[in-house]
């Protein structure tokens, strides 16, 4: 949109509101007959030893608790509401001559009433609100999130046979919990303590692709000297956040030193991976010799550390041969991760308790040798286009 009807750069803006349903499996089932799965029965014996009939209110009837195990409960808050997102963006676009366009924009979103799991009976048998029960997990719609980004794109079209695009994004995503029905907060009554970078937060992202049609030559047969095309794709992005010594969970930890002191970030065969953080910089609050707060939550906030970044360069060469008016053959030679860079896993669960990243990103995502960023590989293909 250019309201001035002149050569000023066009401006566009949009917003939108959309629901984000929690899915069909928000509630689990509850068995009214308490039985012990672990007890092995002799032949002919009852497979439900000590089972009692729960005929009353399961919250008050002692028979509903079972005879040997603390009863855990899953519930949904009676005030649960449908989560929703508010999306908004504004873009400015400017032509650079007749062959290039520059676009700069702000893209953002805000999530409200997101689903969050809480243990409303936390603190154990002696301090819990309902001591006859174990965990009382409750699904609530009290979570929030926000995403803010600056996105820039430069597009080049048919400039002396060159077509390409360069794009850079700076972004920051924050929330209290990223996964649907994700991990429990350290303190179910202090959700604000969980506010931090989202599990997928990627602060910097740069991509570029180029496609160049080589000019033909008058020397030699046309089918050999014409129809050549060279392509390249570049992808660079910073790492994603993680919690040290946590897997996908978040234990309370104190940070008592520089987590990167003495760490080279170089692959080390002796430890079977790439040392990323110094384990000596962390300790469990309240443990012997652990400085800092004794609060079980620790002083290390959620997703405060960032894992390895990613870099990948792919190159391909195409040869197009026109056979008939509506039929041509394309011979393709494609090379992936040309510089054979090791791209280690990033994000939640990628860094072990020894501070080492052991998996490559493809192995971590379940596609060893095939995913983006895996070791250098090459394929040759023949394609018929009609």
Each predicted region: which residue ranges?
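Core nucleotidyl-transferase/polymerase catalytic module
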Residues: 23-49, 56, 65
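Short, solvent-exposed micro-motifs at the edges of structured domains
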Residues: 45-386
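Surface-exposed extracellular loop regions of Gram-negative outer-membrane beta-barrel proteins
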Residues: 1-33, 39, 112-120, 231-240
């Amino acid at each position: 949109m250019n309201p001035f009807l002149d050569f000023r750069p066009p401006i566009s803006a949009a917003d939108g509101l959309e629901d984000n349903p929690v899915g069909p499996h928000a509630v689990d089932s509850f068995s009214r007959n308490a039985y012990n799965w672990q007890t092995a029965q002799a032949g002919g014996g009852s497979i439900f030893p000590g089972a009692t009939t729960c005929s009353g209110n399961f919250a008050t009837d002692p028979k509903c608790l079972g005879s040997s195990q603390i009863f855990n409960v899953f519930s949904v808050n009676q005030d649960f509401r449908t989560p929703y997102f508010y999306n908004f963006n504004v873009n400015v676009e400017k032509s650079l001559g007749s062959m290039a366009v520059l676009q700069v924009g702000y893209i953002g979103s805000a999530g409200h009433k997101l689903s969050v799991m809480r243990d409303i009976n936390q603190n154990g048998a002696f301090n819990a609100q309902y001591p006859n029960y174990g965990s009382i997990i409750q699904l609530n719609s009290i979570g929030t999130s926000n995403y803010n980004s600056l996105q820039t794109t430069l597009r080049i079209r048919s400039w002396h046979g060159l077509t390409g695009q360069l794009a850079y994004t700076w972004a920051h995503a924050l929330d209290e919990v990223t996964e649907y029905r994700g991990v429990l907060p350290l303190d179910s009554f202090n959700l604000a303590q969980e506010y931090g970078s989202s599990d997928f937060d990627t602060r910097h992202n740069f991509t570029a692709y180029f496609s160049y049609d080589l000019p033909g030559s008058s020397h030699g047969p046309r089918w050999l000297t014409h129809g050549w095309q060279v392509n390249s794709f570049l992808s660079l992005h910073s790492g994603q956040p993680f919690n040290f010594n946590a897997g996908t969970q978040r234990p309370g930890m104190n940070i008592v030193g520089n987590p990167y002191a003495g760490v080279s970030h170089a692959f080390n065969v002796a430890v079977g991976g790439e040392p990323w953080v110094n384990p000596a910089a962390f300790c469990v609050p309240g443990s012997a010799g652990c400085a800092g707060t004794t609060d079980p939550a620790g002083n290390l906030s959620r997703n405060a550390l960032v894992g390895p970044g990613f870099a990948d360069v792919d190159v391909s060469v195409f040869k197009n041969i026109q056979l008939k008016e509506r039929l041509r053959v394309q011979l393709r030679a494609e090379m992936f991760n040309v510089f054979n860079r090791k791209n280690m896993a990033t994000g939640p669960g990628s860094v072990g308790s020894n501070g080492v990243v052991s998996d490559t990103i493809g192995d971590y995502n379940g596609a060893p040798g095939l995913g983006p960023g895996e070791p250098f590989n090459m394929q040759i293909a023949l394609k018929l286009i009609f």
